Each structure stands twice: as structure tokens, then as C-alpha cells.
A protein has these predicted regions:
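Transition-metal
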Residues: 1-206
Length: 206
């Protein structure tokens, strides 16, 4: 295919997004201060980019389905059958939610199960909106703190032992490892979590 098409991405207005960076980047008016969290340029079925053609705008995923080799090339079309990545621009103003990504095998099983159950692809209670395992690459355009994974168990045990505000968590970690500790902390009400975090912040400042 020798034709170049103009793509129009899709804005995602999640609560945690900022309200200036993406509108300024994409020359979009945002006088009301609506959050612009993400800008998607891809073929995800829930929000495919729009392709400007001579016949009007069309969804990128539909065009790929009609002519996969023309849009993806023979090798990618044969291996994936669709665009194998989703390019996003993020403007993170508030803390993001904690995410757990499935393995490729679990993603395929979960997606198939929800498809058979007839759950709409955009249903808010749906877990698997595609059958991919979500490996990610992040390129920071400004200062950005990202927490990824967990330290080794012995290192965390030493940390819980050495920091007085965390001593009460030692028995929980000793009994149920990371799963129990994480579950316990996520179920704390805000005041209880703050009682643990505030002394840690004070130590960090010192």
C-alpha cells in the first residue's frame, strides 16, 4: 500500500488526567477544564483511531480487518491478525490505579470466556477487553515516578523490621507473604493507612 492516511486519535477522559497538556498538544479547546487523561492512536476495538479517507472517516480496526496485509504487512498480519500494540499519550495529574496484567494465556482464556458470555466489549464490569497480556514500554516526557513490581521477600522483611512504623505489618507478611500484606493494606480505611504512611514520609524528609 502506497497511500498515507491521516489518523484522528481518541481522547480518554479519565478522572486522573490533566486538563491542559493533551488539549494544547492536539489543539483542542478545553475551556471547561475537562480531564484529558489519554490520547489513543491504535486499533483497539473499544476506541479505534479514525482514518480520514476519500469516502469519509472510518475506524482503523475495521479497515485492518478488511485488508490486513495491506495495512499491517504479510508478516504482522499472519502473526497477529491485528495491530499488535496501542500507542498512547498520557497526562497523569493524579495517582494512577494499581494494575495487575494477566499472562498471555490467561488473557486469551478470559477474553474467550467473556465473549461466550455475551458481555459487551465496553461493559464496565468486563475484565478482558482484548486477548493480549499488556506488556508496556513507557517513555517519560517529564519527571515521572513509576512503581513496578516488588522487592525480594527477604529485602522487604528487613525493611519491615528496620522501620518502626511498619513493625505491625511483620506478622501479616510472615503468615501470608505478599498476597496477605497487599490485601491487608488495600483494605485499610484511609485514616489507618495515613497512620502508617505519615511517619514514613517524615523519615523520608529527614
Amino acid at each position: 500500500m502506497n497511500t498515507a492516511y491521516k489518523l484522528q486519535g481518541i481522547h480518554r477522559h479519565y478522572e486522573w488526567g490533566g486538563n491542559t497538556f493533551i488539549p494544547q498538544l492536539m489543539h483542542v479547546d478545553n475551556a471547561i477544564g475537562k480531564p484529558f487523561a489519554e490520547y489513543w492512536m491504535g486499533a483497539h476495538p473499544s476506541a479505534p483511531a479514525m482514518v480520514e479517507t476519500a469516502e469519509g472517516s472510518r475506524a482503523l480496526d475495521q479497515m485492518i480487518q478488511e485488508k490486513p496485509e495491506a495495512f499491517l504487512g504479510p508478516k504482522t498480519a499472519a502473526q497477529f491478525g491485528s495491530l499488535p500494540y496501542l500507542f498512547k499519550i498520557l497526562d497523569v495529574e493524579k495517582m494512577l490505579s494499581i494494575q495487575v496484567h494477566p499472562s498471555k494465556e490467561n488473557a486469551e482464556k478470559g477474553f474467550k470466556k467473556e465473549q461466550i458470555a455475551g458481555l459487551p466489549i465496553d461493559a464496565p464490569h468486563r475484565n478482558y477487553k482484548d486477548q493480549n497480556h499488556k506488556p508496556e514500554v513507557m517513555v517519560a516526557l517529564s519527571d515521572f515516578w513509576l512503581l513496578h513490581g516488588f522487592m525480594p521477600a527477604m529485602a522487604l522483611k528487613e525493611r519491615l523490621t528496620s522501620l518502626a512504623p511498619l513493625h505491625n505489618l511483620l506478622p501479616i507478611f510472615g503468615m501470608d507473604d505478599y498476597a496477605g500484606l497487599y490485601s491487608h493494606f488495600m483494605r485499610l480505611d484511609q485514616s489507618a493507612a495515613d497512620a502508617i504512611l505519615k511517619p514514613l514520609l517524615a523519615l523520608a524528609v529527614e
